[in-house]
Amino acid sequence: MNLISIPALADNYIWLLHNDDRRCLVVDPGDATPVLQALADHRLTPVAVLLTHHHQDHVGGVSELLQHFPVPVYGPEETRSKGATQIVNEGDSLTLLDHTFSIMALPGHTLGHIGFYSAPWLFCGDTVFSAGSGRLFEGTPRQMYESFQKVNQLSSATLICAAHEYTLSNLNFAAALLPQDSVITDYQRKIKELRLKNQPSMPTKLHLERQINLFLRCHDVNLQNKLNVHPAPSEEWRVFAALREKKDHF
């Protein structure tokens, strides 16, 4: 299987996952035009569309795409009015292109947000970004923290296929908060160079995110000290909440 990232809109990524028979899955098509172009360029034929949540920059291209390729559209209940024809929930599984995808409930960015996981790929929409977290438009910090914990239980080799190119701005925030963290600052320099060449920073591996993503480090004493939040281990979501609020105003 081969993974293709399609830059779209301002800073979105639409994902194509295809096999050797040139059949593919399309994930979160916020705009049909670049998808249709990529399908033509790579001589691919979609067999399904996967939607992680209902926001327009993830579903805006569904209708036009279906005019060209009338395929099933899998998504959470909140995407039913956005073109989803097959509603999927936590615990469901899909077999597509001979791979089984597990559905993960990942509330936070939206209440019905889901992820599609088939090792090594996790299509997680606007939940986990490289070095960052999605904004909380509908859910609570605790919900998003728990979604991050769920993702963190996956294999360290998991490829995080997030839907936006926010990596450098996330690293700028992390480096401002923990300037002595050389893993973060070294990666910040690497991504600056990458983005100057207009190359994508996605997908990212979970083992790297465990080092550079502060939202996966709520147990970190240095981070807790910086935020002046010292919760009991059972309430580490409070660190996540303080971190998310600080990022919102960065």
Swiss-Prot record:
Keywords on record: Hydrolase, Metal-binding, Zinc
Catalytic reactions on record: an S-(2-hydroxyacyl)glutathione + H2O = a 2-hydroxy carboxylate + glutathione + H(+)
Name of encoding gene: gloB
Subunit-structure text: Monomer.
Positions bound to Zn(2+) 1: H53, H55, H109, D126
Function: Thiolesterase that catalyzes the hydrolysis of S-D-lactoyl-glutathione to form glutathione and D-lactic acid.
GO terms for biological process, alphabetical: methylglyoxal catabolic process to D-lactate via S-lactoyl-glutathione
Biological source species: Sodalis glossinidius (strain morsitans)
Database matches in CDD domains: hydroxyacylglutathione_hydrolase_MBL-fold (cd07723)
Name assigned to this protein: Hydroxyacylglutathione hydrolase
